[in-house]
Amino acid sequence: MQDLVRPRGAQVAAFGSGGDTDAVFSDADAAALYDVMNPWNPAGWPADAFYDDLVMAADSVLDVGCGTGSMLRHAREQGHRGRLVGLDPDRAALDRARRRTDIEWVEALASDARWRAEFNLATMVSHAFQCLVTDDELRTSLSAIRAALREGARFVFETRHPQARAWESWSPSHTSDIVDSAGRALRVWHEVESVVNGVVTFTGTTAGSDGGVLHVSRSHLRFLDVETLDAFLAEAGFEIEARYGDWDRRPIDETSREIITIARRT
């Protein structure tokens, strides 16, 4: 999955951001565009392959912030026979996910999850974890995820390392041109509004070939350093099983762009 800025663009707004949409470009169009721009592709993207291996080895998987459900849909297509559950508050994204009826799709926030010891793997892929912006959102979401896991089960996710300052490339000078599923030529770009106390606020704009703006969303992502992240995990009842700075599983160092975490429920 390419993950141009915030992967799963359709569900960014669902985690607390708003957006304006032209009448000819609906929320459903935004969800479909996300799938066109970010297909789940383990053969082409190391991040997708990393998660694919974990999901295929687990008999019960909860994907928190599943968006259009591309990871779980791919797992089922590849022969996963266990329980697969996708959780997301974005209705348009879930409507697209629900085309696959042999997976459970739940419309809710992470903090609203009420499962008890039902899964042996929980995931938040494509930097979805960064949509948990406030301390309260982090605490309540981590608590709910831990409760959903069996004892000793894993919670696996990644967050961008703040030292890499990824947001500095989120600007109108970095655009993506693409043809959507309806055959429309579109241009997509992002622009940072502010960076305050580790929270980056930015807009995402989709325009037509004539330059007319079709959709604008405003989003917030939190960048946690390792020490702060680990404090939240320990408080919630997780211990770190493995930690990587890139998808080739190299340790975190001063060049790392990611904080990839495999945490275990204690």
Predicted regions and their residues:
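Conserved class I S-adenosyl-L-methionine
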Residues: 2-67
